[in-house]
Amino acid sequence: MANILVVTEHLKGEFQDITFEMLGKAKEIAQSTGGSCSAMVFGSMSGQTDQMGAADTVITAEVGDDYNPEAYAAAVKSVVSANSPDLIMIGSTSMGIDIANPVSTALDIPTVSFCADIVAAGGGFTCTSQMYGGKMNVVSSVDGALISMVLAGSFNADTG
């Protein structure tokens, strides 16, 4: 059973496509394993949780409307500590880099970057990452909890 947390991204009051890509993939993995999909929403975007249709649960973090990397990372650390998701999906974006690394370090959870595909495998996950501008694919398998930094455009945003 894979319980998944999707860390949403927004800009100027709009959720970014990467959010819906991750939600769709998270829902697919959760359904295939009998797990659940949660979305984490920040600041005033908590008023737009109706857009998180693929999520079974929406978790809100009151961190203000202006992006603050330290506050966002602290909020994610708190939610991960409280909920112990098996997979934390974060966009492989500038915001994702700000958040994933401190969470990974503080909670001792491995991170796989530039993920173009993720599948549940046994008690963990197998990720395919694109490297060198897509010229090389690297397959990584991780047992246990994982932070996956998802490459934008890897999944269909319409499914999320």
Tell where the protein language model's regions lie, with residue ranges.
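N-terminal glycine-rich FAD/FM-binding segment characteristic of electron-transfer flavoproteins
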Residues: M1-G160
